[in-house]
Amino acid sequence: MDAAEVEFLAEKELVTIIPNFSLDKIYLIGGDLGPFNPGLPVDVPLWLAINLKQRQKCRLLPPEWMDVEKLEQMRDEERKEETFTPVPSPHYMEITKLLLNHASDNIPKADTIRTLIKDLWDTRMAKLRVSADSFVRQQEAHAKLDNLTLMEISSSGAFLTQALNHMYKLRTNLQPSESTQSQDF
């Protein structure tokens, strides 16, 4: 799965908007949305929120976790722990990217949030590289991927898969085949 597919999945996450228009419910295959009343918050999928924002039909409210203090705490905790810590959303990176690209005017301290999310991402990717290196060096057959997001797995998955395939080939070439006869008499 590539980054575009992961981002597509993230667009289904619900975010809160404050519409500036009136509309009864919208009936979609995935469920009903609305009603939309000016000034009253409503939860909608991210894809719809971005579409409405681009048409200047709403104001987006950032998710609860998209707060400078909370993100600083998460970043610091991630740096302290050896293992991956839980993240506030399984699509935190994609949601942040989309909201900051399309609605940064609705997000207080957007530049600081962008930096904190990037720091969190970099810390987690460094941990992932170290874990992958250790995994390959110890010739493990299984890995535990607790608290990793789909985007993090996707971004390192191709490399890790290739590395494991190469290790498998090396291991099978080094082992004596079953058809080889023993020299013992």
UniProtKB/Swiss-Prot annotation:
One Pfam short name: PSF2_N
Keyword field: Acetylation, Chromosome, DNA replication, Isopeptide bond, Nucleus, Phosphoprotein, Ubl conjugation
Single Gene Ontology BP annotation: DNA replication
SUPFAM superfamilies: GINS helical bundle-like, PriA/YqbF domain
List of residues that carry Phosphothreonine: 180
Recorded GO CC terms: CMG complex; GINS complex; nucleus
Cross-link (Glycyl lysine isopeptide (Lys-Gly) (interchain with G-Cter in SUMO2)): 109
Modified positions (N-acetylmethionine) in chain numbering: 1
InterPro entries given in the database record: GINS_A (IPR021151), GINS_bundle-like_dom_sf (IPR036224), GINS_Psf2 (IPR007257), PSF2_N (IPR056784)
Phosphoserine modifications at: 182
Cellular location(s): Nucleus; Chromosome
Function according to Swiss-Prot or TrEMBL: Required for correct functioning of the GINS complex, a complex that plays an essential role in the initiation of DNA replication, and progression of DNA replication forks. GINS complex is a core component of CDC45-MCM-GINS (CMG) helicase, the molecular machine that unwinds template DNA during replication, and around which the replisome is built.
Subunit (UniProt): Component of the GINS complex which is a heterotetramer of GINS1, GINS2, GINS3 and GINS4. Forms a stable subcomplex with GINS3. GINS complex interacts with DNA primase in vitro. Component of the CMG helicase complex, a hexameric ring of related MCM2-7 subunits stabilized by CDC45 and the tetrameric GINS complex.
Family: Belongs to the GINS2/PSF2 family.
PANTHER family cross-referenced by the UniProt entry: DNA REPLICATION COMPLEX GINS PROTEIN PSF2
Name of this chain's protein: DNA replication complex GINS protein PSF2
Species annotation: Mus musculus (Mouse)
